[in-house]
Curated annotation (Swiss-Prot):
Family listed: Belongs to the RNA polymerase beta chain family.
GO cellular component, one term: DNA-directed RNA polymerase complex
Enzyme class: transferase
Disulfide-bonded cysteines: none
Protein source organism: Phaseolus vulgaris (Kidney bean)
PROSITE patterns linked to this entry: RNA_POL_BETA
UniProt protein name: DNA-directed RNA polymerase subunit beta
Annotated localization: Plastid, Chloroplast
Superkingdom to which the source organism belongs: Eukaryota
Entry keyword set: Chloroplast, DNA-directed RNA polymerase, Nucleotidyltransferase, Plastid, Transcription, Transferase
Free-text function comment from the UniProt entry: DNA-dependent RNA polymerase catalyzes the transcription of DNA into RNA using the four ribonucleoside triphosphates as substrates.
């Protein structure tokens, strides 16, 4: 963010800045630090020494561009070259060589990486910051137990605990603890040093007996005692160097390495002056921590709030990539050490080129981007989704929390979150509160803390200064809130203002204020900042709106919103979906594929994205917005991308809506829509699906791609060319063959003809047949073939098979079952598409496009949609667009309502339509029934609302099954649309059928429509001949499975039939 010295003006930071800064920090510092830690490697005889020279590493430019990497399923990476040296100690000869170490995936200008042709992004993680934290808990007797927990940079914990006798223990686990004196002696301190450097020596002396004095008499005795309690399996250990190394590896390395951030936190918390480069836990740290713990017991210090952001740190993309780089260098070290020993054993002369291989680094980063929980496939549903995905903050992941163990206190909003983590935008479900979003003005500092900007208020100087403060600093200042959120200082500050100080809200004089917020949007994420009139909505509905805006699909004809917040331009710009001019010049030529720009005597070709598939199967497409001969300035928009218009974010459409009931078709969040939305392609979207198939080398030969497929109808093969691949531009339906493929296999003995058996018996010839393994279009995949790609890898081995990739474009109009939503959490499913003449219409004869249920507003308390609806009506009439900053009530009361009514009044005057604003019921109007022409009894709210079409579409969900596969164990239909599964009649469904007394339907559902093998086979034949469906006579397979499982537990279960006459029992096996 940039601040002006004379004016209170600021610009938003780059929304991708958090990702780009992290990756640049890794390239600038992380690579050098990792290479400097690489040790010198010697052979067993210490005659040869290998080392890396970290000062002279090189990163080469990628050989391919981003688009080619995506199209060819490659990784957009740079080659890393490092200077190495091999030294012969006897002759002091040195052989230097620059060697290729491996590939490092790069980050593009949008903050994403391309790995195997897929856009991926690394999520920032929130972890407990290394350091020491004091807390108090009650024991079973109700007595307070004070503890100090030291958290290492590895995540290991060492807990200092003081009991009721004022004895201090070091606890490693719940059951294991040891005296702090033994721990300090094992770390190298003697008793006199301990007593000299502690604040309360008499307490340490009080619980020291003769036995303990013997244990801490020397460092060796203390180490033996420490090892005996924590690491010894059995026997009486003897001190040795290997024992000390084992103890270091098992205990000290994991629990005592603080790291750079941990050392800083320890120094600040305990008032120490230990150098920053000393990142290991020292005896002085433990002594000072013990003194603080004793003072805590006597009420001389404060407990720590573990959920405060000052006690958290952000593990950014730089830290994750650096950790993986260190892991790769450890693997490289082991590989080099083994290669040197092998070369000496076989009396070979090693060279740096033979010792170093690129496999450790390349495979480490491939596995990280492909398998790590914090490396995710980029959500490319729309431009907003791409931006928001890179700004997520997660408590989950390695070293973090889990969704099932996290408490409510961790999930809840903390006062330190304000201005740093959005209090609204989080995921729904089990991860609620654990995945947040960075506030729009926040940034990550060099120490891993989230910093928020403030304006400093100084009486001495009139110059405004903007500060970025961490959570540990701003809580000590008086921060003004409320009316001080005004955008200008023209408003006279009141004498008494509300302020925030140390997580409390106070009312103080203006002279006592130190800082004030810079913008009303400062507290919210990008998703929440795009909601107009958000202050009039319930927080739960604002949360839903933030999530649903990320689910909106780009429409074929985008339209920017009439009522917005002003951030739409920034989101569209930083998303990178629009083509921006890098130079000024004249447009020479333009078409749908590229734009030619004449700059300083040269002609630059600017390629455009044409019908490219995103990770969410939506369509990414750029449309030129400039014409031939036009002069273009630097930074001007050349082409709009998906879901952008004129450089602004455009996720939906402004449609005319009315809030009224209509024959029950809009009850319970159902939505009634007009057929105009279908015929005029108002909510039509394009979706691109990718289908691929590979050819492998089998034990009976290689698979063949061909258009001659036996036993298949010619109609299914009509779109194949002579090579057996679908023709570009073909229209394909469900079941059509996209790629014809035959897989060779051996035929069974019983299927051989007499001639084949004779040949096998006389000549030993193996007769083989081929199995049809074609790529067929699955259910719901109808569309137009827009791309065919045959990727042939060099070598053609079975490990690098050939891949054929087909892309199919679908045009989807809005239909019954699709999900639509507004920007206020008002969502619904399309229930009926009504003809235009039957839709309710306004007083000027215009039919409405959508009818919402008015009962969905008051109970959900999202009144912002009513303000937007009425203001959108006036904007549509006046051809105006509004950009409303939230919390406009900071100027005056009822500011939003006054704005809306004044604009409605102006629209009614200028258009000479008095029904737009009627004083008797402002904002409402009489609406007429399109079927009868009569007006409805009560006036209703109507206007223009910005409606989104979400990615939850009926074409992806609707499913039916007549017959299909059954599970092998339970013999019941499979589950899921992808497996052509059936519906499950569960416990509650059985209750419902029982309640209606439909015994025969219930029997059908539980037997031959489900898992009664014998009867369901007989049903088909009797249905064909028109016979009576047989009744099942024995138990279904699920009951048999229950019996078998009980038998596996040594329990026998049988059922018996009792006759009515003599009650004799006839045993029948289950």
């Amino acid at each position: 963010m940039l601040g002006s010295g004379n004016e209170e003006m600021s610009t938003l930071p780059g929304l991708n800045q958090i990702q780009l800064e992290g990756f640049c920090r890794f390239i600038d510092r992380g690579l050098t630090e990792g290479l400097f830690k690489f040790p010198k490697i010697e052979d067993t005889d210490q005659e040869i020494e290998f080392q890396l020279f970290a000062e002279t590493y090189q990163l080469l430019e990628p050989l391919i561009n981003e688009k080619d990497a995506v199209y060819e399923s490659l990784t957009y990476s740079a080659e890393l070259y490092v200077s190495t040296g091999l030294i012969w100690k006897s002759s002091r000869d040195i052989k230097k060589q620059t060697i290729f170490v491996g590939n490092i995936p790069l980050m593009n200008s949008l903050g994403t990486s391309i790995v195997n042709g897929i856009y991926r992004i690394v999520i920032n993680q929130i972890l407990q910051s290394p350091g020491i934290y004091y807390r108090s808990e009650l024991d079973p007797n109700g007595i307070s137990v004070y503890t100090g927990t030291i958290i290492s940079d590895w995540g290991g914990r060492l807990e200092l605990e003081i009991d009721k006798k004022a004895r201090i223990w070091a606890r490693v686990s719940r059951k294991q603890k040891i005296s702090i004196l033994i721990l300090l002696s094992a770390m190298g301190s003697n008793l006199s040093e301990i007593l000299e450097n502690v604040c309360y020596p008499e307490i340490f002396v009080s619980f020291l007996n003769d036995k303990d004095k013997k244990k801490i008499g020397s460092k060796e005795n203390a180490i033996l005692e420490f090892y005996r309690q924590f690491a010894c399996v059995g026997g009486d250990p003897v001190f040795s160097e290997s024992l000390w190394k084992e103890l270091q590896k098992k205990f000290f390395q994991q629990r005592c390495e603080l790291g750079r951030i941990g050392r800083r936190n320890m120094n600040q918390k305990l008032n120490l002056d230990i150098p920053q480069n000393n990142t290991f836990l020292l005896p002085r740290d433990i002594l000072t921590a013990a003194s603080h713990l004793i003072g805590m017991k006597f009420g001389m210090a404060l407990l720590d709030d573990i959920n405060h952001l000052k006690n958290k740190r952000i593990r950014s993309v730089a830290d994750l990539l650096q950790d993986q780089f260190g892991l790769a260098l450890v693997r490289l070290e082991n590989m080099v050490r083994g290669t040197i020993c092998g070369a000496i054993r076989h009396k070979l002369i090693p060279t740096p080129q033979n010792l170093v291989t690129s496999t450790p680094l390349t495979t480490t980063y491939e596995s990280f981007f492909g398998l790590h929980p914090l490396s995710q496939v980029l959500d490319q549903t729309n431009p907003l989704t791409e931006i928001v995905h890179g700004r997520k903050l997660s408590y989950l992941g390695p070293g973090g929390l889990t969704g099932r163990t996290a408490s409510f206190r961790i999930r809840d909003i903390h006062p330190s979150h304000y201005g740093r983590i959005c209090p609204i935008d989080t995921s729904e479900g089990i991860n609620v509160g654990l995945i947040g979003s960075l506030a729009i003005h926040a940034r990550i500092g060099i120490w891993g803390a989230i910093e928020s900007p403030f304006f400093e208020i100084s009486e001495r100087s009139k110059r405004i200064r903007m500060l970025y403060l961490s959570p540990s600093i701003d809580e000590y200042y008086m921060v003004a809130t409320g009316n001080s959120l005004a955008l200008t200082r023209d408003i006279q500050e009141e004498q008494i203002v509300p302020a925030r100080y140390r997580q409390e809200f106070l009312t103080i004089a203006w002279e006592q204020v130190h800082l004030r917020s810079i913008y009303p949007f400062q507290y919210f994420s990008i998703g929440a900042s795009l909601i107009p009139f958000i202050e009039h909505n319930d927080a739960n509905r604002a949360l839903m709106s933030s999530n649903m805006q990320r689910q909106a699909v780009p429409l074929s004809q985008s339209e920017k919103c009439i009522v917005g917040t002003g951030l739409e331009c920034q989101v569209a710009l930083d998303s990178g979906v629009s083509a921006i001019a890098d130079h000024e010049g004249n447009i020479v030529y333009t078409d749908t594929d590229r734009i030619f720009l004449f700059v300083n005597g040269d002609t630059l070709s600017i390629p455009l994205t044409i019908y490219q598939r995103s990770n969410k199967n939506t369509c990414m497409h750029q449309k030129p917005q400039v014409h031939r001969g036009k002069f273009i300035k630097k930074g001007q928009i050349l082409a709009d991308g998906a879901a952008t218009v004129g450089g602004e974010l455009a996720l939906g459409k402004n449609v005319l809506v009315a809030y009224m009931p209509w024959e029950g078709y809009n009850s319970e969040d159902a939505v009634l829509i007009s057929e105009r939305l279908v015929y005029e392609d108002i909510f039509t979207s394009f979706h691109i699906r990718k289908y691929e198939i590979q050819t492998h080398m089998t034990s009976y030969g290689s698979e063949r791609i061909t258009n001659k497929i036996p036993h298949l109808e010619a109609n299914l093969l009509r779109n194949l060319d002579k090579n057996g691949i679908v023709i570009l531009g073909s229209w394909v339906e469900t079941g059509d063959v996209l790629v014809g493929k035959l897989t060779p296999q051996m035929a069974k003995e019983s299927s051989y003809s007499p001639e084949d058996r004779l040949l096998r018996a006389i000549l030993g010839i193996q007769v083989s047949t081929s199995k049809e393994t074609c790529l067929k279009l699955p259910i719901g995949g109808r569309g137009r073939v827009i791309d065919v790609r045959w990727i042939q890898k060099k070598g053609g081995s079975s490990y690098n098979p050939e891949t054929i990739r087909i892309s199919i474009l679908q045009k989807r109009e809005i239909k019954v079952g699709d999900k639509v939503a507004g920007r206020h959490g008002n969502k619904g499913i399309v229930s009926k598409i009504l003809s235009r003449q039957d839709m309710p219409y306004l007083q000027d004869g215009e039919p409405v496009d959508m009818v919402f249920n008015p009962l969905g507003v008051p109970s959900r308390m999202n009144v912002g949609q009513i303000f937007e609806c009425s203001l959108g009506l006036s904007g549509g009439m006046l051809d105006k667009h509004y950009r409303i900053t939230p919390f406009d009530e900071r100027y005056e009361q009822e500011a939003s309502r006054k704005l809306v009514f004044s604009e409605l009044y102006e629209a009614s005057k200028k258009t000479s339509n008095p029904w737009i604003f009627e004083p008797e019921y402002p904002g409402k109007s009489k609406i007429f029934d399109g079927r009868t022409g009569n007006s409805f009894k009560q006036p209703a709210i109507m206007g223009k609302t910005y409606i989104l079409k979400l990615i939850h579409q009926v074409d992806d969900k609707i499913h039916g099954r007549s017959s299909g596969h059954y599970a092998l164990v339970t013999q019941q239909p499979l589950r899921g649309r992808a497996k052509q599964g059936g519906q499950r009649v569960g416990e509650m469904e059985v209750w419902a059928l029982e309640g209606f007394g439909v015994a025969h339907i219930l029997q059908e559902m539980l037997t031959y429509k489900s898992d009664h093998i014998k009867t369901r086979q007989e049903v088909l034949g009797t249905t064909i001949i028109g016979g009576t469906i047989p009744k099942p006579t024995d138990a279904p397979e699920s009951f048999r499975l229950l019996v078998r499982e009980l038998r596996s537990l040594a329990m026998e279960l049988n059922h018996f039939l009792v006759s009515e006459k003599n009650f004799r029992i006839h045993r029948k096996e289950a």
